[in-house]
Amino acid sequence: MGAGHSHDHPGGNERSLKIALALTGTFLIAEVVGGVMTKSLALISDAAHMLTDTVALAIALAAIAIAKRPADKKRTFGYYRFEILAAAFNALLLFGVAIYILYEAYLRLKSPPQIESTGMFVVAVLGLIINLISMRMLSSGQSSSLNVKGAYLEVWSDLLGSVGVIAGAIIIRFTGWAWVDSAIAVLIGLWVLPRTWILLKSSLNVLLEGVPDDVDLAEVEKQILATPGVKSFHDLHIWALTSGKASLTVHVVNDTAVNPEMEVLPELKQMLADKFDITHVTIQFELAPCEQADAAQHFNASPALVGSKSLAAGGN
């Protein structure tokens, strides 16, 4: 038997995240106050969206800090799931906020209040500037850090919301159509809901230890089987500790003519890292399928001996 392990360490630009968080968090308060003073539901709904930016930035920072904490005897996998729990909470909170905004917009469409378009415009422009600065701060790190990239995309999407509010303020200023404010709030709410569902679904998938969305299980099975020295495999499991940190365990039945630890293991580890970005790998080698080969069917991840070369050949 043999086992292979490799570990990666998360990184990120903490300084950029801290500056972006300070800017976004400060303006979030200003936007809520501005929305209340100008009676603009569009501003308030955009502030709700900016709240997700603030939480996303905080999660990214927390994930970097927590990732530095070593695993202990109680949490042998470390503390990576904190990020996922926070993301799931963020999604549930967003659902509630978006539904409230849609309901409030429905009431306002029937009786639109007087909107202070000038104040609405000024606050939205300031929000646009804050988003542009935050994007600039995060742009350098978003290509190398998944956390920073997620925060960058949150800020980018909120920037579009600010543009919508600015357009609404201009329309109200020159036409007096107060209903436009509620209409824009509805659009922002409808835009946020699908993204919220995607975030919640992805979080639940990680918590349920499902196969990561960016990993093609069938292709992994195919590539394992194609590795020289592999006769078959079973008990294959792929899951993620957190976003971008996939793990894999598998039982491999190896050819008796090869040394599995010296010949097969390096090939499998290299292939999984290069093609699927799976770097935390545990492989058990066997000369014949163990008793867990039948039990593996209960997981429905890959039926026992789904990777037999005879089956693969018949499928071509």
Swiss-Prot record:
Cytoplasmic face of the membrane: 1-16, 68-81, 136-151, 195-316
Pfam families with a match to the protein in the record: Cation_efflux (PF01545)
Induction cue: Most highly expressed when the upstream czcCBA transcript is not induced.
Any GO MF annotation of the entry: zinc ion transmembrane transporter activity
Effect ascribed to mutating residue 9 to R: Decreases zinc resistance
Function field: Mediates a low-level metal ion resistance, probably by efflux of cations from the cytoplasm into the periplasm. Also mediates resistance to cobalt, cadmium and zinc via regulation of the Czc system. May repress expression of the Czc system by an export of the inducing cations. Binds and transports zinc. Can also bind cobalt, copper and nickel.
The protein, known as: Metal cation efflux system protein CzcD
Organism: Cupriavidus metallidurans (strain ATCC 43123 / DSM 2839 / NBRC 102507 / CH34) (Ralstonia metallidurans)
Gene name linked to the record: czcD
